[in-house]
Amino acid sequence: MAVAGAAYREPLVHWCTQQLQKTFALDVSEEIIQYVLSIENAEEIREYVTDLLQGNEGKKGQFIEDLITKWQKNDQEFISDSFQQCLRKDEILDGQRSVDQLKRSRRKGRNKQEVPAFPEPDVAVEVKTPLDLAKAQESNNSVKKKTRFVNLYTREGQDKLAVLLPGRHPCDCLGQKHKLINNCLVCGRIVCEQEGSGPCLFCGSLVCTNEEQDILQRDSNKSQKLLKKLMSGAETSGKVDVSTKDLLPHQESRMKSGLEKAIKHKEKLLEFDRTSIRRTQVIDDESDYFASDSNQWLSKVEREMLQKREEELRELRHASRLSKKVTIDFAGRKILEDENPLAEYHSRLDETIQAIASGTLNQSLVTLDRSCEEPLGVLVNPNMYQASPQWVDNTGSTPQKKTSLSAGPRLEPSLHQHQLRIQDQEFQEGFDGGWCLSMHQPWASLLVRGIKRVEGRSWYTPHRGRLWIAATGKRPSPQEVSELQATYRLLRGKDVEFPNDYPSGCLLGCVDLIDCLSQKQFQEQFPDISQESDSSFVFICKNPQEMVVKFPIKGNPKIWKLDSKIHQGAKKGLMKQNKAV
């Protein structure tokens, strides 16, 4: 029955296909139209076709009404024809019954009248040539062909349901319904076959397939023609203008209100970033007093301090009533009890927790331990736990110095400060921790050669002493080298000997970092060389040493530590160079 109904709807299917292609330029497969015509409700057909045409105005509405009229007429004809076919079948069955009765009567000899049998509907075709054989096979295949059902959840079914409009139209299928063209490299939009190759419908940059990209990279006449063809609609596509779309009034108002909220939120975030006010607070339950034993981040001193304070507070909270404070007022004849006996308990608890959370507990302990010692004076590092150096006089007045040192804390301030002064510059110069700084060429070679005396950075470093210099992997251009050499000829003089080559990606040598100054301090203390750097912080470098053999190395940002084996080899290379010099 389904096959007969599909065959009966073929003229209507053909009419729908032609109307959609000619009037609306829609390439819709026959399976979709047959599915629409198989719907039994006229309202469902009207709703489906309206969604397919994206509206029911003008010609679209007229087409929908014509389609429903033809569909109803077609169904009525189909019902009447099927009814007539049923009647014919009943007549045929009655005729067959009469023939059977005649045969039975003829067997009995009562009625000798012969009734002709029904002629065979199909006559065998005589096959004489290969063409006749092919025609016979086609007729057999057409008779045996059955209706094939396609699963809509497979790839084939999805392809048949997808509608591809002619031209480039915005589509939000994300490459699920249509074939994927590519992703926009600027905004990241997923462009499908419906949007097509060309300017991105959001940002306007070119989006094309991999095959088209290969053609464009050839830089030939064909690639220029293809580029011109793809970018032909760049003026009209570009960014999608919301005002050009057909929006309903409530959609337009909702979009405007959303835009206003987004602008207000942007201004709020910019204001927060401008003021940099702390508006959030992290509450860590592990740093609470009651979790002191389980907090793994506390040091041993902090844990002991908390346990001691916990015992004190427990005794204070569960103290005997005999130790309760009572005030007797003889003049007023009153006895006053302590109104809030746990006030001291809560105050001590809060002080301890706040000291641990802020990290000032260790500092308070250090200050308590230091309070009983002698004043520190002008030590470079006041937290150094070692005896202060003593002055050794080689002129023969050592006993007098010793007696003055044994005089106790009643010494003169100048003598006491002189005693506590630490001269650590030689120690820092002699100590090599293997710290390295990565620099671009040709500045790295000029610093190791001693032509460049300072190095500018946007960050401060507390490092002092030997600093290794490594060249990055970027090779300098001849123009950069010539410009930098001309600059340093003006600053240092014409007799400067520049290096012959500027190797990259290797360890060049080392310098001694004397100080790190701000730009203002640098201009005040070194006005002669203030033109060499205008950075926020300036490294003052002295004693440059270049390696004979440059080790290949990969740099890191800021100041980083060398590998121990490379560090030992670099120090040996410097020693060999010093001996050779």
Swiss-Prot record:
There is a cross-link at residues 324, 334 (Glycyl lysine isopeptide (Lys-Gly) (interchain with G-Cter in UFM1)). Residues 100-121, 390-410 are annotated as: Disordered. Disulfide bonds: none annotated. GO terms for cellular component: centrosome; cytosol; neuromuscular junction; nuclear body; nucleus; RQC-trigger complex. One of its GO terms (biological process) is ribosome disassembly. Residues 200-300 are annotated as: Mediates interaction with DDRGK1. Residues 390-406 have a biased composition (Polar residues). Pfam families: ASCH, TRI4_N, TRIP4_3rd, zf-C2HC5. The modification Phosphotyrosine is found at residue 289. Phosphorylated by NEK6. The modification N-acetylalanine is found at residue 2. Ubiquitously expressed. Expressed in the spinal cord, brain, paraspinal ganglia, thyroid, and submandibular glands. Expressed at low level in all the muscles (at protein level) but with higher expression in axial than in limb muscles. CDD domains: ASCH_ASC-1_like (cd06554). It comes from the Eukaryota. Coiled coil: none annotated. Residues 300-400 are annotated as: Mediates interaction with UFL1. Residues 437-531 form the ASCH domain. A zinc finger (C4-type) spans 167-219. Keywords: Acetylation, Cytoplasm, Cytoskeleton, Isopeptide bond, Metal-binding, Nucleus, Phosphoprotein, Transcription, Transcription regulation, Ubl conjugation, Zinc, Zinc-finger. The modification Phosphoserine is found at residue 276. GO terms for molecular function: histone acetyltransferase binding; nuclear estrogen receptor binding; nuclear receptor binding; protease binding; protein kinase binding; transcription coactivator activity; ubiquitin-like protein ligase binding; zinc ion binding. It is found in: Nucleus; Cytoplasm, Cytosol; Cytoplasm, Cytoskeleton, Microtubule organizing center, Centrosome. Transcription coactivator which associates with nuclear receptors, transcriptional coactivators including EP300, CREBBP and NCOA1, and basal transcription factors like TBP and TFIIA to facilitate nuclear receptors-mediated transcription. May thereby play an important role in establishing distinct coactivator complexes under different cellular conditions. Plays a role in thyroid hormone receptor and estrogen receptor transactivation. Also involved in androgen receptor transactivation. Plays a pivotal role in the transactivation of NF-kappa-B, SRF and AP1. The C4-type zinc finger mediates a competitive interaction with UFSP2 and ligand-bound nuclear receptors. It also mediates interaction with the transcriptional coactivators and the basal transcription machinery. Interacts with the thyroid hormone receptor/TR (via the ligand-binding domain); this interaction requires the presence of thyroid hormone. Interacts with the androgen receptor/AR; in an androgen, testosterone and dihydrotestosterone-dependent manner. Interacts with ESR1 (estrogen ligand-bound); competes with UFSP2. Interacts with UFSP2; competes with ligand-bound ESR1. Interacts with DDRGK1 and UFL1; the interaction with DDRGK1 is direct. Interacts with NCOA1. Interacts with EP300. Part of the ASC-1 complex, that contains TRIP4, ASCC1, ASCC2 and ASCC3. This is Activating signal cointegrator 1. It comes from Mus musculus.
